[in-house]
């Protein structure tokens, strides 16, 4: 049948029929009878309109050939065969210019002589049965119905056949020929029996009573009735031409669509100012761990016990001193806080039984560092509403900061492999279905690529710190509890390892609302000298607290050990998300999975194994000033994971805004790359929306600079 259709009908008709079927998700190769029926219907519509014109006097005439210069207008507007968007646009335009009532369903033709829409039917059954089904479906007095059959019968509204005898005879002859051609190939019986009746289900519920009144009350402005609004919505098809849509939406909108060319976009303007500073809740690439392997001490797994054990592995402690003060803080207090921690840990060891938790003495330095009694006193509004000069604090605008190189280094480091594994493969039961087998295989491959990644260490560190802090905030609201910063991993040889990064002391934490803040002081070990990039450490006071012997190629060297101390704060909602940082693994796995799916659908088989095991293939990882960076599939996994982790570590309103707004510009640039000839209006407004998010956040500034690299290369 498919071959017959392609031989029997004009290629333009065949192409239109294929498009129509695809629009409704149907396959011409499978539903061949439907394919033939659509082609037949299209051909009848075109034959109905052929040769019929209206002359300058408004008379209907038939012209088969003749003076091409005669001022003739086609008598029929063909609606059938256009895509839905365009078809509704034509119908709306006809209704607006002629005042004809808008039909509920798309008709096939419009007759400019009789000023009416026409619904054409071609049936393999009895014409009167089909006529009644059509009439019952469209329920419109105004639309004229004209039915033809393959046996030469016809039926039309009020027996008004619109066309002259000869034109209709041409159509009937063509239908009869199609029937004979099908019969001679043995296709007719199947075609005749495959016709289904028109859907006669009422497409609209009648709304009455209270619901009707509510509907009328809740109409958008400028709509007089529900019918009026419905007709507008039915005719409003997405992805049409933008100007038309805008003018349909509002009379006030007057947008000029500007073509978006390779020369149109400019780079994003990054702010000037001092370099941006580190703002994560804990150190990332600069962190130093004191570790114990195969821990088996008494109380193993109790954080305080583990922390003391880790501290004992280090012998190079010395009298601490400040080497990089905090600009605004009382630096001696930070020094005293560290000394207090050392002293109180010593006290614990002197006790007979080590307690499971340690609450610090509320010394003046700790009260200062944790902002105790600093919050202005809350007063009931009733008591102060008569105060004449009651006003909110003036808050300063954030100072713009420029992009600094350290954030790119942080990101690069997060993509690297460490020599330990940070996640265990969960024990999941046997696979039952084949899809589970594929899912397990993908998960195992992905885990193998990211389990040793530094970003995965950050996830586990973040989960631990946030869980411990939230627990302490709820369990010891008034106490200044000491919380060790701990993580656990496995070495290459499979030995368990417990690591201590430093300590947190939390302040008072009566957290009623999700956004109520708990203050904490963090003290973290590091080998990084803060004087190398002082701008990165603006918010920290850094002490030198010891000397560490390191094994290197040239033997042992001694390096100073630093303690990075700062006051910080977080909230219940931030801690909740911090505890769920493992989701980053899932997000990046899903991104990889969509890449595998794309590959599999091209090859029409599951490509998981080939995808992960192909050593030769490289994949695009990201943009840099040098061009598109490429790497192995493992590198892609780790880069996607690092992006997801940094989105969590550096979450902020600036990032939310930048991601949402820059995505719109990205889609336009991609459309240009796909030769879709995008057009824009108010591109300046879009740039403004993106650039107002570029203030001082290191991760947002880095993403903006990547975006500029992408623009440069995408527009070459």
UniProtKB/Swiss-Prot annotation:
Entry keyword rRNA-binding: no
GO biological process: cap snatching; DNA-templated transcription; symbiont-mediated suppression of host gene expression; symbiont-mediated suppression of host mRNA transcription via inhibition of RNA polymerase II activity; viral RNA genome replication; viral translational frameshifting
Record note on cofactor: Binds 2 manganese ions per subunit.
Cofactor: Mn(2+)
Organism: Influenza A virus (strain A/Guinea fowl/Hong Kong/38/2002 H5N1 genotype X0)
Entry GO terms, CC: host cell cytoplasm; host cell nucleus
Annotated EC: 3.1.-.-
Molecular function GO labels: endonuclease activity; metal ion binding; RNA binding
Positions occupied by motif Nuclear localization signal 2 (NLS2): 184-247
Protein name per the record: Polymerase acidic protein
Keywords: Cap snatching, Endonuclease, Eukaryotic host gene expression shutoff by virus, Eukaryotic host transcription shutoff by virus, Host cytoplasm, Host gene expression shutoff by virus, Host nucleus, Host-virus interaction, Hydrolase, Inhibition of host RNA polymerase II by virus, Manganese, Metal-binding, Nuclease, Phosphoprotein
Gene3D superfamilies cross-referenced by the UniProt entry: Influenza RNA-dependent RNA polymerase subunit PA, endonuclease domain
Residues reported in the UniProt entry to bind Mn(2+) 1: 41, 108, 119-120
Main location: host cell
Keyword Nuclease: yes
């Amino acid at each position: 049948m498919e071959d017959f259709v392609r031989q029997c009908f004009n290629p333009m008709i065949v192409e239109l029929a294929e498009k129509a079927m695809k629009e409704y998700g149907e396959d011409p190769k499978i539903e061949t009878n439907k394919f033939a029926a659509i082609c037949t219907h299209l051909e009848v519509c075109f034959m109905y309109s052929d040769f019929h014109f209206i002359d300058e006097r408004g008379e209907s005439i038939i012209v088969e050939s003749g003076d091409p210069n005669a001022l003739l207008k086609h008598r029929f507007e063909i609606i059938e065969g256009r895509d839905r968007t365009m078809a509704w646009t034509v119908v709306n335009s006809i209704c607006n210019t002629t005042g004809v009532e808008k039909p509920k369903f798309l008709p096939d033709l419009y007759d400019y002589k009789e000023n009416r829409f026409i619904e054409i039917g071609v049936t393999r059954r009895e014409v009167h049965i089909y006529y009644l089904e059509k009439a019952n479906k469209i329920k419109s007095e105004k639309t004229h119905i004209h039915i033809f059959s393959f046996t030469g019968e016809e039926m039309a509204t009020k027996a008004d056949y619109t066309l002259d005898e000869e034109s209709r005879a041409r159509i009937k002859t063509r239908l009869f020929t199609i029937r004979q051609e099908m019969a001679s190939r043995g296709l007719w019986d199947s075609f005749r029996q495959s016709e289904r009746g028109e859907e006669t289900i009422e497409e609209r519920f009648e709304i009455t009573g209270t619901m009707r009144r509510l509907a009328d009350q809740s109409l958008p402005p400028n709509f007089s009735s529900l019918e009026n609004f419905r007709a507008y919505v039915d005719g409003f098809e997405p992805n049409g031409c933008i100007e038309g849509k805008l003018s349909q939406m509002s009379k006030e909108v007057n947008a000029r669509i500007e073509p978006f060319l390779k020369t149109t976009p400019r780079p994003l303007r990054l702010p000037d100012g001092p370099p941006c500073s580190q703002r994560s809740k804990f150190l990332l690439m600069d962190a130093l761990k004191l570790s114990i392997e195969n821990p088996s001490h008494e109380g193993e797994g109790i954080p305080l016990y583990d922390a003391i054990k880790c501290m004992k592995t280090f012998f190079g402690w010395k009298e601490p001193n400040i080497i990089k003060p905090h600009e605004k803080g009382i630096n001696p207090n930070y020094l005293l806080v560290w000394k207090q921690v050392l002293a109180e840990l010593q006290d614990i060891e002197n006790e007979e039984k080590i307690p499971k938790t340690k609450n610090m003495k509320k010394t003046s330095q700790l009260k200062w560092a944790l902002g105790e009694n600093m919050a202005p006193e809350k007063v009931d509004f009733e008591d102060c509403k008569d105060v004449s000069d009651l006003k909110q604090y003036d808050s300063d605008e954030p100072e713009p900061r420029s992009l600094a190189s350290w954030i790119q280094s942080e990101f690069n480091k997060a993509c690297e492999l460490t020599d330990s594994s940070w996640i265990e493969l969960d024990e999941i039961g046997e696979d039952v279905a084949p899809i589970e087998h594929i899912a397990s295989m993908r998960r195992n491959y992905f885990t193998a690529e990211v389990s040793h990644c530094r970003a995965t260490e950050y996830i586990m560190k973040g989960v631990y710190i946030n869980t411990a802090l939230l627990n302490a905030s709820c369990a010891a609201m008034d106490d200044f509890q000491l919380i060790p910063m701990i993580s656990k991993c496995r070495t290459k040889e499979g030995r368990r390892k417990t690591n201590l990064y430093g300590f947190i002391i939390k302040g008072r934490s009566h957290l009623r609302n999700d956004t109520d803040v708990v203050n904490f002081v963090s003290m973290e070990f590091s080998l990084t000298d803060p004087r190398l990039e002082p701008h990165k450490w603006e918010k920290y006071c850094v002490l030198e607290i010891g000397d560490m012997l390191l094994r290197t190629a040239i033997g042992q060297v001694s390096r100073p050990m630093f303690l990075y101390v700062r006051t910080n704060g977080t909230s219940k909602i931030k801690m909740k998300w911090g505890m769920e940082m493992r989701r980053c693994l899932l997000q990046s796995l899903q991104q990889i999975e969509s890449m595998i799916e794309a590959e599999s659908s091209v090859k029409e088989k599951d490509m998981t194994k080939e995808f992960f095991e192909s050593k030769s293939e490289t994949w695009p990882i990201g943009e840099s000033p040098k061009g598109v960076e490429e790497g192995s599939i493992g590198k892609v996994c780790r880069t996607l994971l690092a992006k997801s982790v940094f989105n969590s570590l550096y979450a902020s309103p600036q990032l939310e805004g930048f991601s949402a707004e820059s995505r719109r510009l990205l889609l336009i640039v991609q459309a240009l790359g796909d030769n879709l000839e995008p057009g824009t209006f108010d591109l300046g407004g879009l740039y403004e929306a993106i650039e107002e998010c570029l203030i001082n956040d290191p991760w947002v500034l880095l993403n903006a600079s990547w975006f500029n690299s992408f623009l440069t290369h995408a527009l070459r």
